[in-house]
Amino acid sequence: MPWSRDRRGLRRSVPGPMKTPAAPSRLRSAHETGRKVTWLELFFDLVFVAAVAQVASPLHGDYSPAGLVRFTPLFALIWSAWTGHTVFSTRFDSDDVIQRTLTLVQMFAVAAMAANAKDALDTRSSAGFAAAYAFVRFLLVAQYFRARHVPGARPLTTRYLVGHGGAAVLWLMSSLVPAPARFWLWVLAFAIDLGTPWLAVRHSVKVPPDAAHLPERFGLFTLILLGESVVGVMRGMESQEDWPPGAAVSAFLGMGIAFLIWWWYFDGARAASEQPVRTKREAIRFHVWSYAHFPLSLGIVVSGVGVERIVTAAATLAIGLTGLFTMPVMLVATLAVLCGAQLALSLRARMSAAAAAAAVMVS
């Protein structure tokens, strides 16, 4: 904190510089050291995980193939919204008042998505969800529009503006047309959103993301999702009048699954040192690493709901046919988590090894 002296010559602290409302977006160096996740970024992650919990709430009553089919696309949209903002802020976050405001408004829009998610796939109730998601994407477009002036980044920002902007228009249009045309527009818009980063991959080499900060953001999001799984175990135990052996064993195994995921992902993530993206091949691997977190996150949420259901039913063994479906799905979800984590970590390790070899050759 800066210091000054008063009339008596005593030192006193003074506040730091105020955030200027119109500070332009700036390119965050991929070699920047000491960068940490900000409190706003952590708040942003918490809001998104709360939205995921809201979207997953119907799974507690319909843990079936149909329930999973309905949950997965809605989760994919929330995950895509989180990823879009996270990748942008990793590159261009200026932490000015406008950037903070756009981030907070995105959090509000995601909350609106979650509020409309319960019947989002019904023909009568999907317009509000589509309009909220369109608003999220338009806010992301506004952020990239602010970053268009950054030297060397215009080819990248232009492609993101065109891709995400076109998808946002389709999302808005979908809220105005009836089903089933509305859902076909969803598919087209989501495909454009997913394809945009891949079409800009060669330009991302010139404007690489911070290869230390972005893994930290993904790691924190994964950690908060794991925390929600632990909350599910607690809710399952809370529903019991006492602690019957079956419920206690199920809760212990559920906590063990969460701990196994944590160990597998974070111990490996810490072992693999992050390196900047220098070539197109490394940029592609970095994109694959990022997208590998989708099955990882999806599996954590689905297995967490499954563990809660098993703990709740274990006391009386009143599992039923739907409950019998819970156990294999939970196991498959856990395997998806572990495979996603393994893919993510192996790609990161290969990037690190390639960067180390290149450094040795240069030296």
Task: Cite the ranges covered by each PLM segment.
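Predominantly late transmembrane helices and immediately cytosolic-facing juxtamembrane segments
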Residues: 15-38, 42, 47-53, 62, ...
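Loop-to-transmembrane alpha-helix initiation sites
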Residues: 181-185, 325-335
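Low-complexity, glycine/alanine/valine/leucine- and proline-rich hydrophobic stretches
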Residues: 312-328
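Central hydrophobic cores of alpha-helical transmembrane segments
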Residues: 314-315, 334-335, 359
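Terminal cytosolic tails of multi-pass membrane transporters
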Residues: 346-363
